[in-house]
Amino acid sequence: MKTRKFLFTSLLALASTVAANAQTFDVDMLKAQPVYSTENGQGYDIVAAPKAKSNAPFFYSVKVADGNYKVTVVLGSKKKAGKTVVRAENRRLMLDEVSTKKGEFKTYSFIVNKRSPYINDKMNVKIKPREKDYFTWDEKLTLEFTGAAPAVKSIKVEPASAETTTVFLCGNSTVVDQFTEPYASWGQMITRWFGPEVAISNHAESGLTAGSFLASNRLEKVLAMMKKGDYVICEFGHNDQKEKSAGSGAWYNFSFNLKKFIDEVRKKGGNIIFVTPTQRRMFDKATRSKIQETHGDYPDAMRAAAKREGVPVIELHDMTRTFFETLGYENS
């Protein structure tokens, strides 16, 4: 009996090891690589593989389960000088332009969070039709190599440490990983400023309110992926302010929904942070020098909920007003 139990335990351990190894990819980009397919689980994706002397951007995808992955890239080339920008999933900035001289190589590591709509056998995230084209809700982790002269020697993708801290972003178009140029948000740029011990998982989507974020099971997905000690950063109010239905309003429905975020995140042992809504670029018509307030009571309602519940607040509402006014009407 003990022998059988030992054998069964050994087989489970072996299966776990095989599963872990199956999520590790070590890719020599100097060798010919396949075109991505579900069957081979890795390869060039989205656009055709670059030609030998081409400076065209390219994508490389690997099939992995939901979670955090440590990506290590060696940038550079023996044949040319390089200027390489690295993005992940929906244009999530991981490395700003890296310059390498001919024959020079530089190694960088960062964490990429990958997800799918699946939560459990009875629940999925209710993504919008346009999100089906995104690189963020699929079976694969996608890397984009762009810049004036992309030069990539190797790519390694492996499961990140279980101790990796994840920062989950919840919000609207000012936070989302924007899919196409020239659109961008602070949520898809903030990844650039975190080291290889932190993952950013951006669950924001254009047009969402705090209520529609909850109704589409997006917070449920965050809660399913988070662990004790992780962070959830919420910026809402931009679209909530437009709601006119019964029960809507800064001090009623909006405040109620914010409390739900607080309670659910804390129940899982997470840390929640509020971000007051990004200002709209709406200058006064007379002088074109002062930003006009368009969010009504929503910033104050968020501040009040945060004060009452002991939630830290990032004052993006005030900072973006100063930012736009400092740049001026034309430059902003």
Residue ranges with predicted function:
Residues 1-23:
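Bacterial Sec-dependent N-terminal signal peptides
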Residues 67-74:
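A short tyrosine-centered beta-strand micro-motif
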Residues 60, 75-95:
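Short, surface-exposed beta-strand/strand-loop-strand elements in extracellular ectodomains
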Residues 143, 147-205, 218-232:
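Serine-esterase "nucleophile elbow" of acetyl-processing enzymes
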Residues 96-127:
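Extracellular carbohydrate recognition and processing domains
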Residues 23-55, 149-159, 165-166, 173-176:
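Low-complexity, Gly/Ser/Thr/Pro- and Asn/Asp-enriched, turn/coil-prone segments
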Residues 1, 89, 217-332:
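Alpha-helical cap/lid subdomain in secreted, periplasmic
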Residues 53-67:
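Short beta-strands within extracellular/lumenal beta-sheet-rich domains
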